[in-house]
């Protein structure tokens, strides 16, 4: 059994900080569960281009407000209780509204190793 707290993970190398977001990676590839689990904060008033070409992701909004815009498609509002699933490697823009920092619970398949950040194309690399 694996038991971890958000606080202990936040105060370790499992916390990764980027320009528009920070992510506490609570479950990673080395845990051998077949997926990874993160609590990610999207900073207020930001827009992040993301295109997970190597991963599928499901995201549940726990707090805050924003929107997700699928490139070439629709824009969907995000608020607490919203789940969105990137089941087609959807290229998108994630926006947190001003004064509405979003806290999200995220699941990735395949799992990430922990140190990944988006490259210039919004992609996480696939690491064996």
UniProtKB/Swiss-Prot annotation:
Family annotation (Gene3D superfamilies): Jelly Rolls
Enzyme Commission number(s) from the entry: 4.2.1.108
Catalytic activity: (2S)-4-acetamido-2-aminobutanoate = L-ectoine + H2O
Pfam families: Ectoine_synth (PF06339)
Positions of disulphide bridges: none
Single GO biological process annotation from the record: ectoine biosynthetic process
UniProt-recorded Gene Ontology molecular function terms: ectoine synthase activity
Domain of life: Bacteria
InterPro entries hit by this protein: Ectoine_synth (IPR010462), RmlC-like_jellyroll (IPR014710), RmlC_Cupin_sf (IPR011051)
Alphabetically ordered keywords of this record: Lyase
Function: Catalyzes the circularization of gamma-N-acetyl-alpha,gamma-diaminobutyric acid (ADABA) to ectoine (1,4,5,6-tetrahydro-2-methyl-4-pyrimidine carboxylic acid), which is an excellent osmoprotectant.
Family of this protein: Belongs to the ectoine synthase family.
HAMAP family per record: Ectoine_synth
Protein name per Swiss-Prot or TrEMBL: L-ectoine synthase
